[in-house]
């Protein structure tokens, strides 16, 4: 099945599909330049699937915050899709994503999804990252390069998260600086050279990935 067909099957909102395409574009570029080598295709596929169930946590009220979602065509339709997804998979985005992956027989990606979440909340340092999968590490980074408006610098995304949700604690904010520097050491490319313009050129290719 092609990625675009999977997105259609699970009725992924355009905004959510674009988010995953952006993360996958970042992930693909990072993986391509990973110094120790990695399975770039596996990394990219993981990024294309990592938020499949996220519609369950979107605030799709009639007075929706368009600064987060932009213009949504047929809002009533997407409210109905959200209710259907709630009924089938629940209201936890992480569990909904895993439920969809299991149903689609893509269970090989489930451990990476769970691992990425553990790394983030553990504020993983070198000892933990040395034992982690490259797939989860690159997803962790790529997801922190994308805002609703596009691919941005890592620091801009961290500040965006802090502004919107508040820093979880001071150690988290300090850790983000460390992790950004650690990631740069793992690749043979200037991470700041990965931009929205460069990532957008990959969208058509990414939608035709076979999973």
What do these predicted regions represent?
Residues 1-13:
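Generic N-terminal amphipathic, Lys/Arg-enriched alpha-helix
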Residues 7-10, 36-161:
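Divalent metal-dependent catalytic cores for phosphoryl transfer on phosphate-bearing substrates
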Residues 12-43, 107:
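Alpha-helical phosphate/pyrophosphate-handling elements in metalloenzyme active cores
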Residues 16-20, 90, 94, 169-172:
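Generic structural signal for well-ordered, non-membrane alpha-helical segments
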Residues 168-211:
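Charged phosphate-binding loop/patch that engages nucleotide di/tri-phosphates or the phosphate backbone
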